[in-house]
Regions:
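Conserved SAM-binding loop of SAM-dependent methyltransferases across substrates and taxa
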Residues: 246-259
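C-terminal catalytic and target-recognition region of SAM-dependent MTase-like enzymes
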Residues: 333, 347-409
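Non-catalytic accessory regions of SAM-dependent methyltransferases
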Residues: 1-127
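Conserved class I S-adenosyl-L-methionine
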Residues: 236-245
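Conserved SAM-binding motif I beta-strand of class I
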Residues: 260-265
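Non-catalytic substrate-recognition/targeting regions of SAM-dependent transferases
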Residues: 111-124, 143-219
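Mobile active-site "lid"/loop adjacent to the S-adenosyl-L-methionine
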Residues: 307-337
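S-adenosyl-L-methionine
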Residues: 269-311
């Protein structure tokens, strides 16, 4: 192996070599054939080579994780200085400016981990605030260099960035040996805002975002264009939005001209936020229910409520392979109940945000639910996550969101 650097070398087996050559950036602990005699420092850069010594890439070492190395480059001559990382940020931002509409750039995902070659890092923009989540030790160590560059690159493009807030209260950090925490990142020579709340506008709908306490980084940006698709179908219909969270699909449906929208969620806190968002947008064609969807749908069917468009956007029912079977039963139950509740000719929007609930499994589940409900599905659209959450071929973990629009006949 010939490189211009002198990093510790990890040799991997044929299985890992095949994955890496195919574009995947991870090296698992079990796929390492040999490693340096003196164990390198956690989070340091290491080179990865094949069984024959051919260079495969350079990445961050994680001694606590089963994912032992996360590649950041496949160029043996790269120099990983501040200029390198600045180019990476510029490249990611240029991509967003290309694939998103200008109005969407103030509420978008700026960095999507491995898909942007920042393994384990998420950066979301909410108006003038960047909210980050760091899930790898390599990115954690890089923060003093990388985070100021994030602000620098966006500001150089004329974007107003007032601060960077860290949402590292994620249990996955423990797998990297990292503590959970959240708070403002101290940009050199700057003070941060006092408030941890802001407002964004997406598809012409305003949302209050609590990026300190909201789920994940504060708001789910990946469904932005799917919400727009729902708004188009909703016009003139009576809509039930299950798992509404802070009301995003319901608000788009209401603004899109729905006759009436009911937004339902098991969380009273989420319903309160959805009501606040409805008031902010002056939407009066909305009702709100604090109820478990698994109980709500059978009750509404029994009572004969006249909804002709139902939206199912549940949280991930599975985050591991071992629970996929149970998750698919849950997905089938809510989809079956929705199909039974809808009149023939009604509409169904249904989604899954779990990578492990693959599109193949999801389609199979929908077929089974329709069969049991004695309904047939007329497909309108199959959609996915918004393009600021890019799907990197060879990395199936980046392809996680399934979204289907049907007419139920």
């Amino acid at each position: 192996m010939k490189t211009s650097r002198n990093y510790p070398v990890y040799k991997v087996n044929k299985h890992a070599e095949g994955l890496l050559v195919g574009g995947h950036p991870w090296v698992y602990e079990n796929d390492i054939q040999s490693s340096p005699e003196a164990e390198p420092e956690n989070g340091t850069l290491v080179d990865v080579v094949s069984t024959k010594g051919a260079y495969l890439g350079t990445g961050f070492l994680s001694l606590k994780s089963k994912i032992r190395v996360r590649l950041i480059s496949r160029n043996a001559n790269d120099t990983f200085d501040a200029a390198f990382w600045k180019r990476r940020v510029e490249y990611a931002w240029a991509y967003r400016k290309t694939v998103l509409e200008p109005a969407d750039l103030t509420a978008c995902r700026v960095i999507f981990g491995e898909a942007d070659q920042f393994p384990g890092l998420t950066v979301d923009r909410f108006s003038n605030i960047l909210v980050t989540q760091t899930l790898s030790v390599g990115m954690e160590k890089l923060k003093p260099i990388l985070f100021p560059l994030l602000a620098e690159v966006l500001r150089a493009d004329g974007q107003t960035i007032e601060g960077i807030y860290e949402r590292n209260d994620e249990a996955l950090r423990a797998k990297e040996g990292l503590a959970q925490n959240k708070g403002w990142f101290d940009l050199p020579g700057e003070t941060h805002p006092d408030s941890t709340q802001t407002e964004i506008c997406e598809n012409g709908v305003f949302y209050h975002v609590d990026f300190e306490n909201g789920q994940k980084t504060g708001f789910f940006l990946d469904q932005k264009y799917n919400r727009r698709a729902v708004a188009r179908i909703a016009a003139g219909h009576t809509v039930l939005d299950c798992f509404t969270h802070t009301g995003s699909f319901a608000l788009n449906a209401a603004k899109g001209g729905a006759a009436r929208v009911t937004a339902a969620d098991i969380s009273a806190e989420a319903i309160a936020m959805a009501q606040r968002n409805a008031q902010r947008n002056n939407l009066t064609n909305m009702d709100f229910l604090c109820e478990d969807t698994f109980e709500l749908l059978p009750r509404l069917e029994k009572e004969g409520h006249p909804y002709d468009f139902i939206i199912l956007d549940p949280p991930a029912f599975t985050k591991a392979r071992r629970t996929v079977e149970n998750a698919m039963r849950g997905y089938k139950e809510i989809n079956y109940r929705a199909m039974k509740l809808l009149p023939r000719g009604g509409y169904l929007a249904t989604a899954s945000c779990s990578h492990f609930a693959t599109e193949e499994l999801f389609i199979k589940m929908l077929h089974a639910a329709a069969k049991d409900a004695h309904r047939q599905l007329r497909q309108i659209e199959v959609r996915q996550q918004a393009p600021d959450h890019p799907i990197l071929w060879g990395v199936p973990e980046t392809n996680y969101l399934k979204f289907f629009l049907f007419q139920v006949i």
